[in-house]
Regions:
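Intrinsically disordered, low-complexity terminal regions
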Residues: 1-367
C-alpha cells in the first residue's frame, strides 16, 4: 500500500522495467538492501545463491555487488533523484539480512538468520528469523511471527504484533497498541504511550516482565501454575482479575501487589489512564480471536476506499515538519515530568531526529 503511495508522490506514471540478477554466495554471507521508495520483499530458499528481481521505471537503476562477504543491493536513478523500485529477493535461509528504506514496505518470509529491517514510512512484516532481530518503523505497523532470539521491535505511529516468538523481547511504540500472543520468554519489556498492551504467553520461574501504557489498558495472561510476584499500578484506572489472587500489599486504591506460588518471577504492570486486567490464557485467546474477526471484516470494508486515497509529497513534508517542531518538544517535556523518562526520550528521538534528518535531506534536494 505505502509503496504504491510513494510511487504516486514521487514520480509520474512510467513504463515498468524488470531486471534479474543472481549471485553465488559463500557460507556466512549476508544481505544489505537500501531502497528509498517502493517495496522490499525477501524470501528464503535452500540454494547458496542470491536472486534479485527488481521492477522500476525507465530511469531507475539497480546496483548489485558482492562487497567482502555482503551482497549489497541499492536502488538509484540515472538523474540522481530518488527512485521508486520494488525488490523481490531470494536468499539462503540462514543468511542474515539488513533492509532499510524511507517510503518502503518491508516483508521477510522464511529467513532463519539475523534480521534488521528499518523504514520511515512503511510497514514491516517478518515471519521467521533467529538471533538478533531488530525491526523499526516510524509511520507503519510492525509484525513479527515464528521468530526466536534477542528481539527489539519499535514503531512510533502504528501497532505492533508479535506471534509465536521466543527469546529476550523488547517492544516499544508511541501511538499504537502492542499485541503479543504465543510468547515464550523469560524477559519481556513492552511499553506504549497511546494504546493497549496485551500479553499472552509463558511466565517463567525467575523471569522478568514489564508492561506499561500511559493512555491504554493492559491485559496479561497468568497461567494456572505460575510462580510470580505481580506489581500493579494505575492512576485513573481499575485493577481487575477474573480469578482469585492473593493480595500481599496495597498502597491506596490503585497500587497493589500479588504473590502467586513461589513468586520467583517478577511482573510489573503500570497504566496511567487505563485499566489493568489479569486473565487466564484461554480468556485472552478468545478475545484475540474475536478481534481478528473484527479486523478482517473492517479490512474487507476498507479495501475499496484505499485505492482512491491520494496525497502529495509537498503537503506531507510541510505537515510533518510543523508537527515535529511544534509537538515533539512539548510532548517530550510533558511525559518526562508526568510519566516515564524513557518514553520522553523515545518520543523526542523518534520525531525530532528521524523526521528532522529525513525532511532536511528532502529540502536540500530541492535547492
Amino acid at each position: 500500500m505505502l509503496a504504491t503511495l510513494a510511487a504516486a508522490m514521487l514520480v509520474t506514471v512510467a513504463p515498468q522495467r524488470q531486471t534479474d540478477t543472481t549471485i553465488a554466495v559463500p557460507a556466512g554471507a549476508s544481505l544489505s538492501v537500501n531502497n528509498f521508495g517502493g517495496g522490499i520483499t525477501v524470501h528464503g530458499w535452500s540454494e547458496n545463491r542470491v536472486k534479485v528481481h527488481a521492477e522500476t521505471g525507465r530511469r531507475g537503476r539497480v546496483e548489485v555487488s558482492l562487497v567482502g562477504n555482503t551482497v549489497v543491493v541499492k536502488a538509484s536513478s540515472r538523474e540522481g533523484a530518488p527512485s521508486v523500485m520494488d525488490f523481490d529477493i531470494t536468499v539462503p535461509q540462514s543468511m542474515g539480512v539488513s533492509l532499510s528504506g524511507t517510503y518502503a514496505d518491508i516483508t521477510v518470509d522464511g529467513v532463519q538468520g539475523p534480521i534488521n529491517a528499518e523504514t520511515v514510512n512503511g510497514e514491516v512484516n517478518v515471519r521467521g528469523g533467529k538471533g538478533i532481530i531488530t525491526l523499526h518503523s516510524i509511520q507503519g505497523s510492525v509484525t513479527l511471527a515464528d521468530a526466536s532470539g534477542r528481539i527489539e521491535v519499535n514503531s512510533v505511529n502504528e501497532d505492533i504484533a508479535l506471534t509465536n516468538v521466543s527469546g529476550e523481547i523488547k517492544v516499544e511504540t508511541t501511538n499504537g497498541g502492542i499485541m503479543m500472543t504465543g510468547i515464550q520468554s523469560s524477559s519481556v519489556d513492552a511499553g506504549t504511550i497511546n494504546g493497549d498492551v496485551l500479553y499472552e504467553g509463558t511466565v517463567t520461574d525467575g523471569g522478568s516482565y514489564s508492561f506499561a501504557s500511559h493512555n491504554g489498558d493492559i491485559s496479561v495472561s497468568i497461567p494456572d501454575r505460575a510462580n510470580v510476584t505481580v506489581a500493579t499500578a494505575t492512576a485513573n484506572g481499575e485493577i481487575d482479575a477474573s480469578f482469585t489472587l492473593p493480595l500481599t500489599s496495597t498502597t491506596g486504591k490503585h497500587r497493589k501487589t500479588f504473590k502467586i506460588g513461589s513468586a520467583s518471577a517478577r511482573m510489573e504492570l503500570e497504566s496511567f489512564q487505563g485499566d489493568i486486567k489479569l486473565r487466564r490464557p484461554q480468556e485472552l485467546r478468545d478475545r484475540i480471536d474475536r478481534k481478528h474477526k473484527h479486523d478482517q471484516n473492517e479490512n474487507e470494508n476498507d479495501s475499496d476506499s484505499d485505492s482512491s486515497w491520494h496525497f502529495d509529497l509537498g503537503s506531507v513534508t510541510a505537515y510533518a515538519t510543523r508537527y515535529a517542531a511544534a509537538y515533539a518538544p512539548k510532548y517530550a517535556a510533558q511525559y518526562a515530568a508526568q510519566y516515564a523518562p524513557r518514553y520522553a526520550r523515545q518520543y523526542a528521538r523518534a520525531y525530532s531526529r528521524t523526521y528532522a534528518d529525513t525532511y532536511k535531506w528532502q529540502r536540500s534536494r530541492k535547492h
